[in-house]
Amino acid sequence: HNLNLIFEQYISRFAELNDLDGNDEGYKWRAESCFVEHWDIDAEDFVSMFKASTKEMSNLIDNATVQPIGGILLLLKQPNEVEFVRECFRELYEEDGGDLEARQDRIYVFMEKMNAKIDQYASGSWKYPQKMNNVIYYLSLRYPNDNYIFKATEATEWANCIEYGDDFGSGETFSLAKYYRMCDELLSAVSENDEIMELHSRRFEKEARGFDDELHILVYDIIYCAHTYHFYTDGIIQTTSAKERIKRAQIRDEIEKLEIELAV
């Protein structure tokens, strides 16, 4: 089973992946701790608060090519835009009672407003705009036990490997609910793996302060590491294409329906 093979690699390479002088994947939990410690939407000095909250994100968001946090900081350099940024985050972080469609709508609104404003100060920039995965990460920072970090390549590769029976799409067709459902399935599988739970609880004790994400960052870490550290390329793990995966899922559903009908 592909999932067990991935879990085996995650366990056997855990020390290497979390080596502070090496890959240091534990920084994801430190970034969350830092955000939780400093975030205050009503802070008098919003700019300093925002910088303090986001300072440990490392390459989770900004890298040499794209800098969405840099885009927000560009706006925060303009004294007359600070309240605009604050209100965008306030709207994004509204309670939604678990309504993922409403949440996805707020993601789009945040992107549209922010990007239109960023364009006023950095016209045509490809470096600063907010993308879907960035905004999902902002949500994960604020409500880590209610969201999952998302990166398209890693997520699609994972779905193909485990033959996830649904298509969360991409771009305009993306479905937050379907992506989160896939993550929920991984969450329930990994929480039954005693070895990973043991390794993770030691890491969590070391790296995390002031929050309980209910293993949601761990779920993303497994999806991310499987892609980044080539868990799929040892020849044992067979991956399918998204198209083939969805087709197989539909056939499975039809067989199940027939079996139910025949059993009646």
Predicted regions: what they are:
Residues H1-Y128, P144-V264:
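An N-terminal alpha-helical hairpin/helix-loop-helix interaction module that forms a charged
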Residues N134-R142, T156:
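Contiguous, well-ordered alpha-helical segments that form the cores/surfaces of helical PPI scaffolds
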